[in-house]
């Protein structure tokens, strides 16, 4: 068996990382260790590595004292409720055996996956990096002092964007509540206006949520972000959309428009 592991920059991350990796090794499972990473990066790494699953060590947008495990299947997708229940059942019953010393798992470090992820994004047919370069955008990025402070500026800079970094040191000391809600984003809203930036980007610690700030310092809500992206994608590739109950009616309207 082989499992891909990545973590956000939480202060407890190295401790939890050592615990999880060494437990897997003790069970005879090989580990591909991505080090500091993002949830979407681990998701793409699992099938690329032909791994049996993945684990992201993160508590997502929860405050810094939290930490947890996000579990992925061999497709790099989150486990179903049924599979999650099986994992808990095995753990609670302690229905597992550690490997003998000749059958321990091996750890392989691969810290290239954030760069690989960026390359994959830039190669998407719907991403026109050359067009973005002609616009000479200036963008403020709030990485909440986690791994988003690495990957988001690097992606933007490869598209010719001038990046103003705010809280982009991956030290795990979150300068504000990491959930990207309006009431937590006063600093970036102010900086976007001060820097005369075109817009701002805020991500949560494991970079599976983001919010945009307009050039006037006002938040461009998550529901509008989804609709704007869907409008662009459907204009190039007409089709259907699937959403959850928290999505606005606007997504349905945009889908029907195309």
Segments and roles (model prediction):
Residues 2-66, 154-213:
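N-terminal small/polar loop signature for handling phosphorylated ligands or for N-terminal nucleophile
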Residues 41, 85-119, 123, 214-258:
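Proline/glycine-rich low-complexity loops and linkers
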Residues 1-8, 138-140, 239-245:
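Short glycine-rich phosphate-binding loop at a beta-alpha junction
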Residues 13-18, 84, 149-153, 252:
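Short, surface-exposed alpha-helical segments at coil->helix boundaries
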């Amino acid at each position: 068996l082989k499992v891909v592991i990545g973590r956000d920059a939480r202060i407890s991350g190295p401790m939890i990382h050592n615990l999880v990796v060494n437990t897997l090794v003790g069970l005879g499972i090989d580990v591909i260790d991505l080090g500091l990473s993002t949830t979407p990066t681990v998701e793409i790494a699992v099938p690329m590595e032909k791994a049996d699953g993945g684990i992201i060590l993160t508590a997502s947008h929860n405050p810094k004292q939290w930490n947890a495990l996000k579990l992925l299947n061999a497709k790099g997708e989150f486990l179903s409720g049924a599979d999650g229940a099986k994992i808990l059942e095995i753990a609670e019953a302690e229905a597992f055996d550690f490997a003998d010393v000749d059958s321990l798992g091996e750890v392989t470090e691969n810290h290239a996956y954030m760069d690989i992820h960026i390359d994959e994004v830039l190669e998407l047919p719907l991403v026109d990096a050359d067009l973005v370069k002609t616009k000479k955008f200036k963008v403020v990025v709030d990485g909440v002092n986690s791994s988003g402070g690495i990957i988001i500026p690097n992606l933007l800079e490869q598209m010719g964007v001038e990046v103003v970094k705010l809280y982009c040191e991956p030290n795990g000391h979150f300068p504000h509540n990491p959930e990207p809600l309006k009431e937590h984003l006063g600093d970036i809203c102010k900086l976007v206006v001060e820097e005369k930036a075109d817009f701002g980007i805020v991500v949560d610690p494991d970079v599976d949520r983001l919010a945009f700030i307009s050039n006037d310092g006002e938040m461009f809500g998550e529901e509008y972000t989804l609709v704007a992206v869907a409008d662009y994608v459907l204009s190039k590739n007409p089709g259907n959309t699937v959403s959850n109950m928290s999505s606005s009616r606007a997504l349905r309207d945009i889908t029907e428009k195309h």
